[in-house]
Amino acid sequence: MSIVRSDKPFVLAGRTYQSRLLVGTGKYRDMEETRLAIEASGAEIVTFAVRRTNLGQIEGEPNLLEVLSPDRYTFLPNTAGCYDAVEAVRTCRLARELLDGHNLVKLEVLADQKTLFPNVIETLKAAEVLVKEGFDVMVYTSDDPIIARQLAEIGCIAVMPLAGLIGSGLGICNPYNLQIILEEAKIPVLVDAGVGTASDATISMELGCDAVLMNSAIAHAQQPIMMAEAMKHAIVAGRLAYLAGRMPKKLYASASSPLDGLIK
C-alpha cells in the first residue's frame, strides 16, 4: 500500500518557518565568516551558547547582535556547557533576561566532556522546570524513543535527538531509533549533532525529520560558505524525496522498459 504524503508547515512556538535548516554560530574564523555562512545557508533560526556569546554584556568584544539582526533571524539560545539541571535552568533564565523576555530556548545538559552525550536524567529535570516557567523548550536528547516521548509529555515543543556525537561528523549512526521516534512523535523532531556533510542532512530529511540543526559540518568545512549553501539544497532535496516517497528496494533487476512490443 502506497503512502501519499502532503507537506505541512514547519512551526515552532506558533511561528512558521520556510527553512528547515537551523544553524549554530560557533567555530567560525570570525564574525564575518559567521554572517556570510548563515546567509548562504538560508536558515531563519540561529542558535548560540549563552555562556560563550557576547550579546552586549561585554564591552569592547564582538557582539553577535551587531552581526545578526534579531529582525531577520529567530535566536535560539542554548545551554551548551551545562552539566546539571540547575546550571541549565539558570542559563535559560539569563538568556531570557539578556534577550528581553525571549522564551524560545534549546536545552542541552551534557554528561561528560569526552562524548558530550546528553545526561537524560538531568535533561528531564531541567525540562520540567523550564516548561513550568513558561519557556518554549527545544531539547537535545539521546536517540532513545522512550526519553523522547517523556520530553514531549513534559511539554517540550520539539525533541532533538543526536544522530552522532556532537562535532563528530559521523553522520546518521542509528536511523532505526530515529524512525521509531518519528513514528511516535506528536511534536517536531529535529536531528541535532553528528551531521558531517550534505548527504547526512538529506538522509535525515528523507527519514521524515522536520528539520536539522548543525554547526560543525559547516564551520569546519574547508569552504564553510560553500558548504552552507550545499546544506540548504540538501535539506530541500531530502524533504522533497521524503514527500515523494522512494521506490521499493528489490533484490533483482527490473527493466525500465517492458519487453512487450519489442522491435524484432
From Swiss-Prot:
Leader peptide range in chain numbering: none
Metabolic or biological pathway: Cofactor biosynthesis; thiamine diphosphate biosynthesis
Catalyzed reactions: [ThiS sulfur-carrier protein]-C-terminal-Gly-aminoethanethioate + 2-iminoacetate + 1-deoxy-D-xylulose 5-phosphate = [ThiS sulfur-carrier protein]-C-terminal Gly-Gly + 2-[(2R,5Z)-2-carboxy-4-methylthiazol-5(2H)-ylidene]ethyl phosphate + 2 H2O + H(+)
Active site: K106 (schiff-base intermediate with dxp)
Location(s), subcellular: Cytoplasm
GO (cellular component) term, any one: cytoplasm
UniProt record, GO biological process: thiamine diphosphate biosynthetic process
Entry's family note: Belongs to the ThiG family.
Function: Catalyzes the rearrangement of 1-deoxy-D-xylulose 5-phosphate (DXP) to produce the thiazole phosphate moiety of thiamine. Sulfur is provided by the thiocarboxylate moiety of the carrier protein ThiS. In vitro, sulfur can be provided by H(2)S.
Entry protein name: Thiazole synthase
Gene (UniProt): thiG
